[in-house]
């Protein structure tokens, strides 16, 4: 059984301080996109995991954590074989590991017909990682607390297009948060502040990744004719551009946009919404870089 394991974007991310446990409190808007990995689950005589990136075929892979949590909860202990084909870069800030973990939970529930509810899967996901519960939402959601509390967001972002810019070097989440200063916190939580679409972690990450700061400024210059938003997803290192889909209704503007994407080596993707009674399905452009 093959399952699509999609990436996500943080369209904005606001830090509000630290909790009593020392974790950073935040508000973020999540959007699942039609770019991602493929996870295959099959019955086996023993537990195995094969990945096209050998460094991820380890006991530390979150797929194994999902399997253990699923077994503890359901008492289903049959051995399984996983095959993971990665396209999402490591340390990209677009939820690759979290998506794989969530997809593994969904796949196990389908494979063994354990009939766990979506709410149950979401609660299990909270035990794995901050972003994991997102993937049991519709695909558009607001994250609060430490990002793991998911609020439905029905204003589906289908009218926006996104262009991704990956980095050859990822960013560790712990490094991004270790460079946060108190002055980085957003003290306002009203709707206007949230929709400014800033990512407060940019201030932290740019302190030790000047290359990403310079890349963002370069992208802002390239995209300025289209008044597009340029931001960073999560803890980085992925930068992204968003612009209204309606801009492409003008053929000359559409051509200019796609020329800019090609010249800047971006990847054009779309927002993705989960099937009402199933999982996320990949779209036709999954394997195709923007041209």
Swiss-Prot record:
InterPro entries: GHMP_kinase_C_sf (IPR036554), GHMP_kinase_N_dom (IPR006204), IspE (IPR004424), Ribosomal_Su5_D2-typ_SF (IPR020568), Ribsml_uS5_D2-typ_fold_subgr (IPR014721). GO terms for molecular function: 4-(cytidine 5'-diphospho)-2-C-methyl-D-erythritol kinase activity; ATP binding. One of its GO terms (biological process) is terpenoid biosynthetic process. The keyword Transferase applies. ATP binds at residues 89-99. Its EC number is 2.7.1.148. It catalyses: 4-CDP-2-C-methyl-D-erythritol + ATP = 4-CDP-2-C-methyl-D-erythritol 2-phosphate + ADP + H(+). The active site is at 8, 131. Catalyzes the phosphorylation of the position 2 hydroxy group of 4-diphosphocytidyl-2C-methyl-D-erythritol. This is 4-diphosphocytidyl-2-C-methyl-D-erythritol kinase. It comes from Chlamydia caviae (strain ATCC VR-813 / DSM 19441 / 03DC25 / GPIC) (Chlamydophila caviae).
């Amino acid at each position: 059984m093959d399952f699509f394991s999609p990436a996500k974007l943080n369209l904005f991310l606001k830090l509000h301080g630290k909790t009593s446990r020392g974790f950073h409190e935040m508000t973020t808007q999540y959007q699942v996109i039609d770019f991602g990995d493929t996870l295959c689950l099959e019955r086996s005589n023993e537990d195995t995991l094969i990945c096209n990136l050998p460094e991820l075929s380890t006991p530390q892979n979150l797929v194994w954590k999902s399997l253990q949590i699923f077994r503890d909860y359901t008492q289903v202990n049959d051995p399984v074989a996983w095959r993971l084909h990665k396209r999402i870069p490591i340390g990209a800030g677009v939820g690759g590991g979290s998506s794989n973990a969530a997809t593994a939970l969904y796949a196990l529930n389908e494979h063994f017909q354990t009939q766990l509810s979506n709410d149950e899967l979401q609660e299990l996901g909270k035990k794995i990682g901050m972003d994991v519960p997102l993937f049991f939402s519709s695909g558009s959601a607001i994250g609060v607390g430490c990002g793991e509390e998911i609020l439905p967001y029905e204003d589906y972002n289908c009218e926006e297009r996104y262009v991704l810019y990956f980095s050859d070097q990822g960013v560790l989440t712990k490094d991004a948060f270790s460079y946060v200063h108190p002055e980085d916190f957003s003290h306002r939580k009203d709707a206007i502040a949230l929709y400014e679409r800033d990512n407060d972690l940019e201030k932290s990450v740019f302190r030790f990744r000047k290359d990403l700061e310079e890349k963002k400024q370069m992208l802002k210059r390239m995209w300025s004719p289209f008044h597009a938003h340029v931001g960073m997803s999560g803890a980085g290192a992925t930068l992204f551009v968003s612009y209204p889909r309606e801009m492409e209704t003008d053929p000359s503007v559409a051509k200019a946009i796609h020329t800019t994407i090609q010249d800047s080596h971006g990847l054009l993707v779309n927002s993705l919404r989960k099937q009402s009674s199933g999982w996320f399905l990949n779209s036709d452009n999954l394997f195709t870089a923007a041209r």
